[in-house]
Amino acid sequence: MNSFLSGVKVLQVGDGIAAAAATSLLANLGAEVSKLCGGFSPSRVGPMIAVGAASVPLVDVVLDRGKRILRSPSDTSALIDAHDIVIVDHDAAIDPPQARNAVVVSVSPFGLTGPRSVERGGELIAQATGGMLATIEGSDGTPVPAPGYVALKAAGAVTALAALHGLDRSEHATGRLGDQFTTPLDGARS
């Protein structure tokens, strides 16, 4: 069966929710997705599921479904150039790669440049800066965060759209690959 992104190769670099949600969406559209792990497991909230002798956050099981998990290769640039789209998470602790043959989308809390670019983010920060935190109040009027990584998953959807836009622009409008985009989690454009 031919699907929308059949033949498109996507590489996820890092373990953040937004990047994982973006690549999960692209995988559901038919892309072949590989995930390059960072060597550490970020802490997650929510239900855990037993996988062998270990417990794994259910959100990771859901978002990593259908992905090929890779360990650090000896030649990262060759790995990057073997993909059409590379999505780099802000917690990956690497600079956004330069790619000759791929669209690179970086997910960061406040963009890659500017006065807040070095600040850490996360679900609560994304909900607060995006205005979502103001939509639910407790009985005493204080803000209540939405459960389930809602803001980071929404940022993942925007990241996937940025990747598809870059792919379309690179292949059809300019005839070249190698465009770079940034998806700040606070909703601002950088």
Task: Give a label for each model feature.
Residues 1-179, 185-187:
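N-terminal helix-loop segment corresponding to the beta1-alpha1 unit
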